[in-house]
Amino acid sequence: MGVIEEGAKKSGVLWLSLDRPRLAWHAWHDGAIYVVTGGGEQPLPGLAERGEVQVTLRSKDNGGRLIAFDATVEVVDQAESADAVAALAKERLNAVDSAGLVERWAARSQVVRLTPRESAP
């Protein structure tokens, strides 16, 4: 998983294959990618209902495709995954309510863990 981890840590955005390719900001934490959707955050329609999604990471150097891989999708309990939610909040740029961000997510958004499948490089 070296290329995936390195790419996810270096780039602040990725592409998800949903109803159409969707750009999403994210955080890498504990071997997985975390994204937040809904409640005024980035719209990622249908992600939370999926079991799997294709993720494409781009190169921070030239913006080109670095690697694409399948990941399992799991909506996390935000209270039980507080460290991951904190890592994700730290990556949130230009939040209008940064002081109440985590509380707003808990009330109105879903935090989703994308775990690279074992066959991913």
Annotate each PLM feature.
Residues 1, 19-21, 73-75:
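Solvent-exposed, well-ordered amphipathic alpha-helical segments
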Residues 3, 22, 56, 60, ...:
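Short, well-ordered helical secondary-structure segments
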Residues 8, 12, 51, 89-93, ...:
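Generic secondary-structure transition motif, activating predominantly at the C-termini of alpha-helices
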Residues 9-39, 45-47, 53-57, 67-68:
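Short beta-strand segments
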Residues 62-121:
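Charged, gly/pro-rich active-site loop segments
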